[in-house]
Amino acid sequence: MLNRDLLKIERDAVRQATGVLTAANDATESNEQRDTRAHELLADIVDSIPEGSRLDDNSFEAVIQAGINDLYYLGPIEELLPDTSISEIMVNAPDDVWVERAGMLRKVPVTFEDDEHVKFIINR
């Protein structure tokens, strides 16, 4: 999960990458090829952002993966999907995400940047 500073870097990179990746969309490439292409582009963009160029390797990769999740998957909630104990995910607000496990609701530390980020994921 990204903190607010990393989330801002990620969202800036995704905004810049969206047009480039949409224009270069190739329906014949596999998801792995598409993700690799997005990873390379996002890495270049994050490196060009002053705050991004100062990230340690773990934070850098977390920002890139979050960007790929935003571009092609379910954004910040993607990391919850492998957890088979979760039966429902509810996004009430950018910083108000809940899961249901064994009939119990629990708030999780998953955060979207803002309402526009939530809408971006929904409308994709």
Residue ranges and their predicted role:
Residues 1-4:
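Short, charge/polar-rich alpha-helical segments
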Residues 12-124:
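N-terminal "pre-motor" subdomain/linker immediately upstream of P-loop NTPase catalytic cores
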Residues 6-9:
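Long, compositionally biased regulatory regions of eukaryotic proteins
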